[in-house]
Design a protein with these regions (language model features):
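Gly/Ser/Thr-rich phosphate-binding loop
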Residues: 1-77, 91, 111, 115, ...
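Conserved ATP-binding/catalytic segment of the ANL
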Residues: 92-169
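Alpha-helix termini
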Residues: 7-10, 79-87, 128-131, 147-152
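Short secondary-structure boundary micro-motifs
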Residues: 26, 56-57, 86, 125-129
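Glycine-rich phosphate/pyrophosphate-binding loop
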Residues: 69, 73-106
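Generic secretory/membrane-interface signal
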Residues: 37, 43, 80, 135, ...
Length: 169
């Protein structure tokens, strides 16, 4: 909401030099930093029901950071609002830099406890994604991997958009 307000000379006259939060779109990242005089912006990504989260603690611009969990981006057709499968009906992993649907691998360490409605819980779990019998939490978000220079050989991700019929800020 701040970036949509009319500019005023006092905006940079604040004591903030760093902020921590989530939801800052990449297309307004640079403008936000410059306009409000913010040197360090740390982002995080996650959901209360999800089994996967990200943290940008290294101050890499326009990124939600790294994931300690089992993240997978699969090809997604935005126009038709559906996952893209290969000719054998298998999921296709998104290429580097290509937006893909974020899935979080469900296992003993990264569990999905579900909702109070079992049918709703079942709809969020995709099965046999990489191998027979596996389970993946469908976040409903499109992300892409980006190059941030050094990253300890751990991929960095950028938020792209929510899929489906969702409220937009």
């Amino acid at each position: 909401y701040l970036i949509n307000q009319p500019e005023c000379p006092e905006e940079k006259n604040n004591s903030l030099d760093r902020i921590f939060g989530n939801g800052l779109r990449p297309d307004i990242w640079d403008e936000f930093k410059s306009r409000f005089g913010i040197d360090r912006m740390c982002e995080f990504y996650g959901s209360s029901e999800g089994n996967i989260s990200f943290l940008n603690a290294l101050n890499k611009n326009k990124t939600i950071g790294m994931c300690a969990g089992n993240a997978l981006l699969v090809k997604y057709d935005i126009e038709n609002d559906e996952i893209i499968y290969d000719t054998e009906g298998k999921f296709i992993e998104a290429e580097f830099g290509e937006p893909g649907l974020l899935l979080g691998g469900v296992d003993d360490r990264y569990q999905f406890d579900g909702y109070t409605d079992d049918d709703a819980s079942d709809k969020k779990i995709l099965r046999n994604v990489k191998e027979q019998g596996d389970a993946w939490f469908n976040t409903g978000d499109l992300l892409k991997q980006i190059d941030v220079g050094f990253a300890f050989k751990i991929p960095h991700y950028q938020f792209v958009d929510r899929i489906g019929d969702t409220y937009r800020w």
